[in-house]
A protein has these predicted regions:
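Short glycine-/acidic-enriched loop or helix-start segments at secondary-structure transitions
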Residues: 7-10, 32-34, 132-133, 160, ...
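Catalytic core of DAGKc-family lipid kinases
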Residues: 13-119
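Short acidic/glycine-rich loop or secondary-structure boundary segments that cap or lie
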Residues: 75-78, 115-117, 128-132, 156-159, ...
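Gly/Ser/Thr-rich active-site loops/lids in small-molecule metabolic enzymes
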Residues: 84-91, 137-158
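N-terminal small/polar loop signature for handling phosphorylated ligands or for N-terminal nucleophile
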Residues: 1-16
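Hydrophobic structural packing positions in well-ordered secondary structure
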Residues: 2-5, 24, 78, 121, ...
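Glycine-rich phosphate/pyrophosphate-binding beta-alpha loops
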Residues: 71, 75, 122-135, 202
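ATP/nucleoside-binding phosphotransfer catalytic cores, i.e., glycine-rich phosphate-binding loops
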Residues: 109-110, 115, 140, 150-244
Length: 244
């Protein structure tokens, strides 16, 4: 699953003679959803054996590596506390909504310097997380940049209204609440300890960094795969992975 993939990535970064892949037997298997219907090819061990090794970007966050998505804010709190509510995301979400959505954070990087109430920040190298949230649908793990969404302080009612669009990647319709950034570095400071979601794993701290490592890990994929993109004919891009 995604958690095991994250562990493997953390062991493989920096080793040019090592490649990792994803045999999807976990609960979410979010990372490979970016391949659309072709993600089913990852179930075929023979295809993986005959596959191709491609360099993918990773991000470094708080001393750990992530290949997919990291986040800070209410979604990270909901995911971290879900086990306190009998593994119910709904109960965890309701509880955290009543606790309050925004936290006072200072955000720097990608041309932004902001201090104030912040509901959520996601750092995307991949596309899907949390069982199907797709905040930045055209994020690419091989294009040499990270993409970020900063959701500012919003009321509970506004958050409930916007979360559906956030989950579907329609952030451009919410520019009054959400700022989109691109770059290779973002840092967050908080006076209080906050939880950070790193590919589904939780860490805690008062200072959080997201730093790009271009081509940081070799990833094995079935031959001639392309990323899913709903705006292209047939739903798949015509280009292959970027070769480096």
């Amino acid at each position: 699953g995604d958690g095991t993939l994250n562990e493997c990535v953390n062991g493989a970064v920096g080793h040019a003679n090592v490649a990792v892949t994803h045999f999807p037997c976990g609960t979410g298997n979010d990372f490979i959803k970016m391949f659309g219907e072709e993600k089913e090819r990852f179930f075929d061990l023979a295809e993986l054996v005959r596959g191709e090794v491609r360099p993918l970007d990773v991000m470094e966050c708080c001393g750990r590596y992530a290949i997919n998505i990291c986040s800070v804010g209410i979604d990270a709190r909901i995911g971290t506390e879900v086990h306190q509510y009998h593994d119910s995301y709904i109960f965890s979400a309701v509880a955290n909504l009543f606790k309050g959505i925004a936290q006072p954070l200072t955000v720097r990087g990608c041309g932004m310097e902001y201090s104030g109430g912040t509901s959520l920040i996601c750092a995307c190298n991949g596309r899907f997380y949390g069982g199907g949230f797709n905040p930045i649908p055209d994020s690419m793990p091989d294009n040499g940049k990270l993409e970020f969404l900063v959701v500012r302080d919003v009321s509970r009612l506004t958050f409930i209204r916007l979360v559906g669009k956030y989950a579907k990647g329609r952030y451009r319709e919410l520019e009054q609440y959400i700022t989109h950034l691109e770059g290779d570095h973002l840092e967050i400071d908080s006076e209080n300890e906050i939880v950070v979601n790193i590919d589904g794993e939780a860490l805690y701290g008062k200072h959080v960094n997201f730093d790009l490592i271009p081509g940081g890990v070799n990833f094995l994929v079935p031959a001639n795969m392309a990323f899913f993109h709903p705006e292209t004919a047939g739903g798949h891009e015509t280009r292959e992975f970027v070769h480096t």
